[in-house]
């Protein structure tokens, strides 16, 4: 069995360089919620050095709230903003001899695109316009995954090690209790259950079906590095290979 392990990087966290030795894919902030040209360049350089797949992490234009504010923007605006961000990272990667492999929206853009078909379509269309060979990463079973498939893109369904789930397979909003799993043992058990058995127990006790093709590790967590190492060890014990 193989699983991709991804982390959101270039967001000002001190652990980026070390996380790149533990993950197989990096989602690099493109300036709209965090990061800048120099940080993008540095992240790309480190990703290439570690053999980690490079991906763009586009966001709503919301540096003030780290891309976590809900926005109602016209689909054409989102299309243009997404194209702008992934185009910038693709060029930075190419200039350093690398290749951008995937795109994963950030924060509220990701969450809204999971449920809003028009928004999902705008993102998938931008990814396709930039490069039809790019992989589109989205929440397992979401509108974004459906939109990607409609454009003929390769999609990668994502699950979260440290997030609580609702009965329909969606994430518990960060504003609600149970959104974040801070108990390491619980997060580890949830991740193995999703990867090995394709299901997750919701905060209300029901089992939800999920397709786990990539697992997100949040690099901004207090114990991100220690948990990443534990997860790698657990995968190795179960014979699960970490690879993009």
From Swiss-Prot:
Gene inactivation phenotype reads: Deletion of the gene slows growth on minimal medium with ammonium as nitrogen source.
Enzyme class, first EC level, given as a word: hydrolase
Which keywords appear in this protein's UniProt record, sorted alphabetically? ATP-binding, Hydrolase, Nucleotide-binding
State the CDD domains in the record.
Answer: LamB_YcsF_YbgL_like
Tell me the Gene Ontology biological-process terms attached to this UniProt entry: carbohydrate metabolic process
Q: Highest taxon of the source?
A: Bacteria
For this protein, the Enzyme Commission number is 3.5.2.9
Note the Gene3D superfamilies from the entry: Glycoside hydrolase/deacetylase (3.20.20.370)
- Which reactions fall under this protein's catalytic activity? 5-oxo-L-proline + ATP + 2 H2O = L-glutamate + ADP + phosphate + H(+)
* GO MF, any single term: 5-oxoprolinase (ATP-hydrolyzing) activity
Q: Write out the function statement from the record.
A: Catalyzes the cleavage of 5-oxoproline to form L-glutamate coupled to the hydrolysis of ATP to ADP and inorganic phosphate.
| Matching HAMAP family | PxpA
Q: Which family does it belong to?
A: Belongs to the LamB/PxpA family.
Q: How does it assemble?
A: Forms a complex composed of PxpA, PxpB and PxpC.
Q: What is this protein called?
A: 5-oxoprolinase subunit A
Species, as recorded? Escherichia coli (strain K12)
């Amino acid at each position: 069995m193989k699983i991709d392990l991804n982390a959101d990087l270039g967001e000002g966290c001190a652990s980026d360089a070390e996380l790149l030795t533990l993950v197989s894919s990096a989602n690099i902030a493109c300036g709209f919620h965090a990061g800048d040209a120099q940080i993008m360049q540095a992240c790309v350089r480190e990703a290439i050095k570690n053999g980690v797949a490079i991906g763009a992490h586009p966001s709503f234009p919301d540096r003030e709230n780290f891309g976590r504010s809900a926005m109602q923007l016209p689909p054409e605006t989102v299309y243009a903003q997404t194209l702008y961000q992934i185009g910038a990272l693709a060029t930075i990667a190419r200039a350093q001899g690398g290749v951008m492999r995937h795109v994963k929206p950030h924060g509220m853009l990701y969450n809204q695109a999971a449920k809003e078909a028009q928004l999902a379509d705008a993102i998938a269309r931008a990814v396709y316009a930039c490069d039809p060979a790019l992989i589109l990463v989205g929440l397992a079973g979401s509108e974004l995954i459906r939109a990607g498939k409609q454009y003929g893109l390769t999609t990668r369904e994502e699950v979260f090690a440290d997030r609580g789930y609702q009965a329909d397979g969606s994430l518990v909003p960060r504003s609600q209790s149970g959104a974040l799993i801070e108990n390491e043992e619980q997060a580890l058990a949830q991740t193995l259950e999703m990867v090995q058995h394709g299901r997750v127990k919701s905060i209300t006790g029901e089992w939800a079906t999920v397709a786990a093709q990539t697992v997100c590790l949040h690099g901004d967590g207090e114990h991100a590095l220690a948990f990443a190492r534990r997860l790698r060890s657990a995968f190795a014990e179960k014979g699960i290979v970490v690879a993009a």
